[in-house]
Amino acid sequence: MGKRRKPRREEAGSALSKKQKKHLKEFGEQHPFYDAVSKKQETTQVVQLPESSEDESRSESEAESDPEPVNMYHKLLATLNTVSDEEEEESDDEEEEALEEAEEEDEAEEVGEESEAEDEDNEDESDGEGHGQMDELPVEAEKAGDNEEEERAGDPAAEEAGEFTDAKHESKFSLETNFMDEDNEDSKDESVPCPTVATEDPFVQHVGRELEEQDISKIGTNPKKASLKWPALGQLGVSSSLPQLQPLKVEKETDLQKLYLHKPLFSTWPKVNSPFLSVDKEQNFTPLQRELFSIMNSYRDLFFPARSPTAQGEEIRHVYCLHALNHVLKANAQVLNNNSQKRDQKPGLDEEDLRDQGLTRPKVLIVVPFRESALRIVQILISLMEVGGRKVDVSNKKRFKEEFGSEPEDRPPNLKRPEDYEAVFAGNIDDHFRIGVAILQKSMRLYSPFYSSDIIIASPVGLRTIIGSEGEKKRDFDFLSSIEVLILDQADLYLMQNWEHVLHLMAHLNLQPTDSHGVDFSRVRMWNLSNWAKYYRQTLLFSSLQEPQINSIFNKHCFNYCGQVAVRNMPVTGSISHVVVQLPHVFQRLEADSLLTVIDARFEFFTSKILPQYRDAIMSHTLIYIPSYFDYVRLRNYFKKEELNFTHICEYTNRSGVSRARQFFLKGERQFLLVTERFHFYKRYTLKGIRNLIFYELPTYPHFYSEVCNMMKAWHRGEEATWTCTVLYSKYDAQRLAAVVGAERAAQMLQSKKNVHLFVTGENG
């Protein structure tokens, strides 16, 4: 029997693309967005169960027995080399469901499921099939990869990782061996003044300022704070620790050259940005873009927590691409101009005036969640360099489109999801990638080795796998040592991926490199040599929501001497106003002494005060929404220990397991259904049969609150009067509470002596 199984595994493995095999090898599982499940999965599970090793079974049983401390889960989450809790959860779910089905009506249940499946189930299946093909490259792409094998020399680390990096055009894009093209008329105005020359150019002022020891000691201590209100951005919080900085104001200048845009940006930007502009008005920026660029161009840090994936996403992407490319073009022009001066050896030339570089070449790091985002960024950068319809020379463009693009047929035509879901998961949603981009005058090189790149575009997990962990032999983070502009776009999505990767990245930014990497130290700025790069780095942070974890990045990892600007608009109504079903919402406040104890306090409050009210059979069809996966595991273990009648779904549950759990819950065969927030984020299914709803914690995304509540209307049989909704919150959930009920109500609830508050929605409907 063993000899017959081996070809099956090989056949199953051959059906995976190279990317899927690589992802499976590195992480031990497919991405939670995908549902690549074999049609004969149940049979395969039963056959493989006896083959499970004793160690694996023992670890699974231990994971199921007692709730483990939360801090231990965080330690496991931060370690890539060990087996994750998610893998144990998935294998445990499959084992339990397979045994359950084997004892009962195995095939009959499957037939019943298919016959009773709703239209949405059909959509979900096609959804999984369509997205499962997204990562697969066409045959032409694989052939192209084979033809470019010769170009991989010069980057051993990338070769070992199986990545393609272009080393063929190294000399063409080298800053050390190129000079300003003086014969070209377009290049005469491209030189950037030396930092010692008096100029109002924000770039020159920023990188040219030499801080003193006393200035460094002041940064972050007792900053001066001020509040501003701008028409588009709203309420701003401005802070700065150093005096003698230019006051922050909205730039009203319409002449792009006077905004210190480098060639060719002041001629290409109006055309590239035209889709967002009104035809009847002569303008180069939308009101939002103008205010954002005013802050970016002042080189202050920026936190914008109102980035909608639907309305403003592309506007913001365009304006930060403009700023990033403007910074790179100016920096490179300064280096090339100084190369020419050094070559000509003009009399009176001071070597100190030629300090124009960092310890490594990468200047801009753009972190985005999916390949589709990287694709759009590169397309914008290319468009911004195309002058007068003349195509820019882009190396490896074909390969880039094949690896980062997607086909229209990859998306199922009958997929119906909310607008924000369609915007977030458009195109190629692979979240493991990194790519270097080198820019020199009128040419661009994609897949440039990191130490020959100006811009690095990557996902958090893509960076984590190259940064590595302490103790690993093959790890590299020197390329992050001289990052001058850091852009974290769609930061809220990293909470749904793995926030530990973001923290790991921030901890390795602007550290002194372990190797010289061939740098000419006579050209390195003094503040880079003094290990002060983090005080010059500008951080642009964009998110669709305010969350303590995101706020901590801005507050604890940003040290820009120019100061910080944070948009601080409070929600007025909250997402509860979008609940259309007639439903009483009972908000119960739990007490906790500190942020460290709130997790245990919530569990104790739920098991002792809330759950006993729902144990009665009359309180069936109870859905428990759990934002944290660790809380989900803890509750699941507790429910099993108490032998409660429940089923559960998380982001790692396979499609057949999800279908069974939904059917059990809909028919009332299981009293409770535990659901994680990440499952709802990645799938956005409508779960039918809900009569009682419990939010174990307020949702990360406020609109998820109204979405889950409105699921009740999908299955109503005249029982609306008995529906209930219970929400647990603490004083540490102030931001999430304000996003759900509104800022004014949230303040009243947190200050009130009462611990229970009632809201009723849909009274007129």
UniProtKB/Swiss-Prot annotation:
Protein name stated in the entry: U3 small nucleolar RNA-associated protein 25 homolog
Gene giving rise to this polypeptide: utp25
Lineage: Eukaryota, Metazoa, Chordata, Craniata, Vertebrata
UniProt GO cellular component terms: nucleolus
Molecular function terms from GO: U3 snoRNA binding
PTM comment: Phosphorylated. Phosphorylation is required to promote p53/TP53 degradation in the nucleolus which promotes cell cycle progression and liver development.
Start and end residues of each stretch annotated as Disordered: 1-170
Species this protein is from: Xenopus tropicalis
GO biological process, one term: rRNA processing
Alphabetized Pfam families for the sequence: Utp25_C, UTP25_NTPase-like
Family: Belongs to the UTP25 family.
Subunit structure: Interacts with CAPN3; the interaction is required for CAPN3 translocation to the nucleolus.
